[in-house]
């Protein structure tokens, strides 16, 4: 017990510190060492992000790894700054174990979280260190500042240009009630208590393809705390549809049940911003909705409307039928992406939706 307690205090003293981070400007390349917990997950190329949470475990999105048949195909890169040039502070590890949350729901992205155990521990440095995790009693209220990082696309059809530098962008927490209102245009049951939303009403800033599994962090004092794991959204940051993340604080017990040695550091984030009022009315968007669903028509309960920001197949042909359909033959993966669809279009094209 004494040893385990010492290990926990050790991680708690290390987590969430980024001495090379001087605050950031949204949409810019991140200086080396700014986000030392950021990892890049590779099969044959970068597919997703993730967060280092202790010396041997990474937290990512379940949809990033649920399709993998075995761990040898997956490599974790830590201390990486760019995807196509040398990275002097980088180390890599293979993955020996993948643990997907048992409640992960493939069509609906609920409980979209997974743990990866690396082949051996890493040594912490200014460029490689763990992030703190939001404890179960954390509160992230409306308008709280947050930051998202990753190597994903810079636009819907715009891959990250060479040399593929790690990008950072600011975001604001969106209340769960408002987020449910926004996504009710698609389905009343999209947003659950296991999710946290962030973004801006006007859209245009946030995660895109290739950013899945990466961190949404907020700063408290000198510590950065992981609030969410990039999960899904509509298009790439469509107006009036905030990006959706797995809410890390909901999974404290599950994470602790699988990591019994050198446990991650959990800290309670206390927000001073406006509390989410569940019985308030929905804010009517001032901007044109990104989805055109005819009045009186009930949308199908298919979360294939939306996209998980995974980047498994970058060279796929796109078929535009008022929605975008992508099929990845490698790994037999199917991704359904949204672009201005309605009930009648779904009825006509339903045969394409096979998850």
Sequence positions of predicted segments:
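Cleavable N-terminal signal peptides of Sec/SRP-targeted secreted and luminal proteins
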Residues: 1-13, 76, 337
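Conserved H-D interstitial segment of serine endopeptidase catalytic domains
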Residues: 17-21, 58-61, 66-106, 176-184
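Extracellular trypsin-like serine protease catalytic domains
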Residues: 18-25, 38-42, 144, 149-306, ...
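A conserved glycine-rich beta-strand in the N-terminal activation segment of trypsin-fold
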Residues: 36-55, 108-109
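Conserved active-site neighborhood of the chymotrypsin/trypsin-like protease fold
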Residues: 58-62, 110-135
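Active-site substrate-binding loop(s) of clan PA
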Residues: 102-105, 121-168
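Mature extracellular/luminal domains of secreted and GPI-anchored eukaryotic proteins, especially small
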Residues: 296-334, 339-343
């Amino acid at each position: 017990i004494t040893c385990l307690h010492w290990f926990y205090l050790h991680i708690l003293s290390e987590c969430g510190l980024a001495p090379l981070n001087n605050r950031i400007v949204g949409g810019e390349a991140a200086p080396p060492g700014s986000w030392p917990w950021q990892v890049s997950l590779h099969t044959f190329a970068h597919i997703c992000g993730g967060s280092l949470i202790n010396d041997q475990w990474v937290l990512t999105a379940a949809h990033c790894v649920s399709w993998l048949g075995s761990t040898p195909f997956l490599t974790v890169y830590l201390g990486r700054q760019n995807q196509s040039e040398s990275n002097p502070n980088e180390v890599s590890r293979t993955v020996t174990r993948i643990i997907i949350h048992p409640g992960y729901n493939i069509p609906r992205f609920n409980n979209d979280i997974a743990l990866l155990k690396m082949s051996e521990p890493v040594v912490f440095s200014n460029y490689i260190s763990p992030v703190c995790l939001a404890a179960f009693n954390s509160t992230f209220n409306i308008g709280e500042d947050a930051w998202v990082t990753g190597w994903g696309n810079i636009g819907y059809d715009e891959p990250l240009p060479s040399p593929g530098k790690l990008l950072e962008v600011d975001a604001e927490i969106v209340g769960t009630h408002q987020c449910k209102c926004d996504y009710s245009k698609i389905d009343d049951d999209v947003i659950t208590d296991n999710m946290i939303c962030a973004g801006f009403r006007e859209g245009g800033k946030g995660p895109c393809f290739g950013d899945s599994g990466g961190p949404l962090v907020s700063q408290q004092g000198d510590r950065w705390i992981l609030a969410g794991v990039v999960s899904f959204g509509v298009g790439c940051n469509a107006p009036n549809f905030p990006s959706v993340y797995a809410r890390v604080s909901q999974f404290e017990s599950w994470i602790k049940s699988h990591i019994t040695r050198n446990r991650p550091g959990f800290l309670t984030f206390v927000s001073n911003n406006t509390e989410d009022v569940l019985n308030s009315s929905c804010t009517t968007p001032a901007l044109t909705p990104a989805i055109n669903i005819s009045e009186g028509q009930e949308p199908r309960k298919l979360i294939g409307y939306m996209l998980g920001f995974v980047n498994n197949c970058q060279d796929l042909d796109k078929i535009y039928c008022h929605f975008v359909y992508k099929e990845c033959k490698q790994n037999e993966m199917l991704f359904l992406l949204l672009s201005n669809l309605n009930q009648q279009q779904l009825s006509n094209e339903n045969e394409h939706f096979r998850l």
